[in-house]
């Protein structure tokens, strides 16, 4: 009977529970992550779902393996790529411009060349800054000045004329006074129109009639 009592006591013994501290820590680590930041989070979820509770101390190595599986899955995660949509749009905008229209296009080129690809989603703010740098450089561009060569030539032509020789010189003066400086390259047609207005006004000039007073007097005297 005594032997049976010992047998029963041994049979009633229960192993201590295995230590799940590492497992719980790994799960907490996994839960703290934003699954949407990663290309594929399924490995982590599978490792967490594979955890079996109620293992005892003789099975500690299995429990530790569960923790390691979660940690390994977390370590293998890859962030999604950053979104370069704004960068690509800004580059397309820059490429659509004619660099020769601007006084200095180097700022735009520098901003485009400073773009670094392959940033991940955690670096999105850097990528957005690249896009903004290009947009800012485009916004800061200044057109080259319009070419006033024809205008200046027409004005010089007008200034060389003796206004007293013409019946009405006001059209020429008005055309010269209508010249507006400071136009840029995109307004060249307006500048060319100023030159044409002066040229047209000069072409429309009419000389005053010659003075025949002395001739008439001489004829009268002869008669």
Question: How would you name each of these model-derived features?
Answer:
Residues 1-223:
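Beta-rich interaction/scaffold domains
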């Amino acid at each position: 009977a005594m032997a049976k009592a010992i047998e029963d006591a041994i049979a009633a013994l229960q192993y201590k529970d295995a230590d799940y501290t590492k497992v719980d820590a790994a799960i907490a680590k996994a839960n703290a992550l934003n699954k949407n930041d990663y290309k594929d989070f399924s490995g982590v979820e599978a490792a967490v779902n594979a955890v079996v509770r109620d293992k005892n101390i003789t099975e500690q190595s299995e429990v530790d393996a569960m923790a390691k599986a979660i940690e390994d899955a977390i370590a293998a995660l890859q962030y999604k790529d950053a979104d370069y949509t704004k960068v690509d749009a800004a580059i397309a905008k820059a490429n659509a411009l004619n660099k020769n229209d601007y006084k200095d296009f180097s700022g735009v080129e520098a901003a485009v060349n400073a773009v670094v690809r392959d940033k991940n989603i955690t670096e999105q703010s850097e990528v957005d800054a690249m896009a903004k740098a290009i947009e800012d450089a485009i916004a800061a561009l200044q057109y080259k000045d319009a070419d006033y060569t024809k205008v200046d030539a027409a004005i010089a032509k007008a200034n060389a004329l003796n206004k007293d020789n013409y019946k009405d010189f006001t059209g020429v003066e008005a055309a010269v006074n209508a010249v507006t400086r400071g136009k840029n390259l995109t307004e060249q047609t307006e500048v060319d129109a100023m030159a044409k207005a002066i040229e047209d006004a000069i072409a429309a000039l009419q000389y005053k009639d010659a003075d025949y007073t002395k001739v008439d007097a001489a004829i009268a005297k002869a008669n």
